[in-house]
Amino acid sequence: MHTSIVTLNLDAYQNFLANAIFCNLLLTMCLYWFSLIIVNNNLICNLAKFSAVNSNVILFFYLSWRWYNYNFFPLSNLYESLMFLSCLLLFIYQFIEFKTRSRVIGALVLPLIVLVQGFASLSLPTAMQKSSPLVPALQSNWLMLHVSMMMLSYATLLLGSLFSILYLVLYKDKKILTKKSIKEQFVEENFVFQLTTSAFSLNQTSNIITEAKTDRQRLILSLDNWSYRTIGIGFPFLTMGIISGAVWANEAWGSYWSWDPKETWALITWLIFASYLHARLTKGWRGKRAAFLGSFGFFIVWVCYLGVNFLGKGLHSYGFLN
């Protein structure tokens, strides 16, 4: 009886924290868009940033709390991986925002984080939100390495692909840049300086950005460069995740590669982003062509991460649609 009461209290506390995180993220997104489009006020801007940091702290505490209570790294099921992805997206975008001093980054990324968090907290069945004992094959140190590398790659590749999508949107629709506050946030001198002096930037790309004559040119070229750099960071994480997964699979099931649907789509994702980086580095691709390929990668990542997991087949299945 006492154990049942404790379990109910833990479940209620988890639900409260998860709902608080979602509501806080929704508020943060609204504050970002309000400060960007309606009122460019320092108080609202600072409140939005504080709310974002607060969301990340609560989310980090929530994951740490689950780790402490269940005695294994909180990446054992879909719910925890979605929470972990939200935490990574929050941290990475806040780092980029700190470097660029541009609120547009948060306004772009936060809707994605809210959708991820909403899907985890509101759409997944309650049974899928609870931690359960790991099967023997998952009771390995490879769990933390493999899954964390894959989640880091998903977070960075999704952000890089988002920048490519925004590049295409702004390239096609010039009216979006007519709002003064948005234009100022994206093309202020410090933002361009941070992009053009980064160690990840090619000299040729930096010169093109510096020589751009209009705010619009500087904006879309900066987005192109930032997308390239972010994808360039995420690709090694994806590579390490695939390799560590193969080694782990050999230890657990005696085979490095079994053409499981998840493995197949991870390879497809790797090939897409390898093609993107190859085209940029050796073929000189930039602008629309590179952005189309990067944008395509956004959907490929989601298919790899979620799509194949819901089919009910393979070693990585969550069986949600069964």
From Swiss-Prot:
Question: Which terms under GO biological process does the entry name?
Answer: cytochrome complex assembly
Q: What is its main location?
A: plastid
Bilayer-spanning residue ranges: 19-39, 43-63, 72-92, 104-124, 150-170, 230-250, 264-281, 291-311
Give the bilayer topology: Multi-pass membrane protein
Q: Which GO terms describe its cellular component?
A: chloroplast thylakoid membrane; plasma membrane
Q: Which InterPro entries match?
A: Cyt_c_assembly, Cyt_c_biogenesis_CcsA, Cyt_c_biogenesis_CcsA/CcmC
Keywords from the named record: Chloroplast, Cytochrome c-type biogenesis, Membrane, Plastid, Thylakoid, Transmembrane, Transmembrane helix
**Is Membrane among the key words of this record?**
yes
Q: Name one GO molecular function term.
A: heme binding
Question: Where is this protein localized, as stated in its record?
Answer: Plastid, Chloroplast thylakoid membrane
Which domain of life, per UniProt? Eukaryota
Q: What does this protein do?
A: Required during biogenesis of c-type cytochromes (cytochrome c6 and cytochrome f) at the step of heme attachment.
Q: Describe the protein's quaternary organization and the partners it interacts with.
A: May interact with Ccs1.
Q: Which NCBIfam families match?
A: cytochr_II_ccsB (TIGR03144)
As for family, the record states:
Belongs to the CcmF/CycK/Ccl1/NrfE/CcsA family.
Stated name of the protein: Cytochrome c biogenesis protein CcsA
Natural source organism: Heterosigma akashiwo (strain NIES-293 / 8280G21-1)
